[in-house]
Structures are given as structure tokens and as C-alpha cells.
Amino acid sequence: TRQGRKSMPLRKIEGSLGKNETIYDYGAGRGVDYIHLLATGHKATACDPNTELGKCKVHKSDVVISNYVLNTVPPGIRDKIMKDIASSTKNRAYLTVRRTGDRGTPRYDGYITSRNTFQKYFTPDELKNYTKHYFGNCKINKSVTNGDSSSVICKDPKCFKCHSSN
């Protein structure tokens, strides 16, 4: 988020978040959205894999929010994060990623940008198809999806303790 402002995805979905629902902000960064959720009376928890040194745990919550996380990690890590998100979700997950940006040097299924960071850009359909491996029901979140971002709402998380990890 820019300079202490809540993220665009949170601004778009905030009205659909119930005060009695537990919310897990997975990939919270500096915690701006998390702090806003707490300040507005929501029951929220947050974790960021970068600041927690990969120690984000499954945290069962009614709603999981993950904004601009999946597009910043390579495939193997992305799969682990998606399993954590699915395992943490009781009701629904809101997932938003970058759709466009700096296309530097090809690496894995994305790019190393001019800032030396990894980015995987997803079209709305690519994100929907990818997340369906982890949830039984995903649809494009048209209120958040725009020229820069792709977003989905997912329900019916699949059980990953039932599957072997690759």
C-alpha cells in the first residue's frame, strides 16, 4: 500500500467483510490493511512471509485476504502459499495479483524485473484457473479486476493434508 493508505483491493471488498468474521491478511507487508481492519472493528490477524521469515502458519479464518503476494514468488513457493491460504480459509478467500508490469529477464514462469524482483503476471482467467487447483469454486472478482490487477473470490478450499506435496 502506498504511504499508509489501505490497498485498492481492500477498499473494493471492505463492504463485504462482516464484523463478526475472522480475517487473515496473508502477505500483510507493513500491515496497513491489517491495521485498518482492526481500527474499523474487524477481528483480524496478519502475517507476511518476508517479514516472518517464512513462518506464516495456517490460521483458520472465515476470510483470507492476500493482495499482491502470489505474483511475487516463483512456482514452488507460490504453491506452498496457496496451500496455506486454502488450509486457512473457512468461508472465502480474496486473492489479487498484478496483471501487468516490468517484463525484464524471463525466469521460471515470470520475470526478474529491473528492480531485481520476481514477478508473474496473471490475466484474470489465468488466476482463476490457477486458484481452482486449491479451491472448488473461484470466480473473477470484477469489482477489483482492472487494467493493472487480476482478482478472484474463492470458496470451498480443497484438503491439502490429503494430497502429497510436490
Indicate residue ranges for each PLM-predicted region.
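A short, conserved alpha-helix within the catalytic core of class I
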Residues: 73-84
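Hydrophobic adenine-recognition pocket in adenosine-nucleotide-binding enzymes
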Residues: 69
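A conserved beta-strand element that flanks and buttresses the S-adenosyl-L-methionine
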Residues: 65
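Class I (Rossmann-like) S-adenosyl-L-methionine-dependent methyltransferase catalytic domain
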Residues: 1-59, 84, 92-166
